[in-house]
């Protein structure tokens, strides 16, 4: 896998399966996947992240979508949010749906 940053829209992705993943479970699975793939990740949360770590950021007074939309490319986006996907399509090398990411990537670890 390329070493391109993989940006994960946390609230969108954790709600892509039933039952919904907790913030902590999403972080644990995303980190396990990143280690296995050798890929850097950035998990972006609405509000504060569940812990203070360099691979997790909160949105402050904005939405996670706005934070992600302001990121410089290139990056991969993991989100099923159509509006966000449209906002970043010129900078995203690859866009992966949240459910697909959880089923295919995270369960493979």
Pin down the residues of each PLM region:
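Nuclease catalytic cores that cleave nucleic-acid phosphodiester bonds
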Residues: 3-8, 12-109
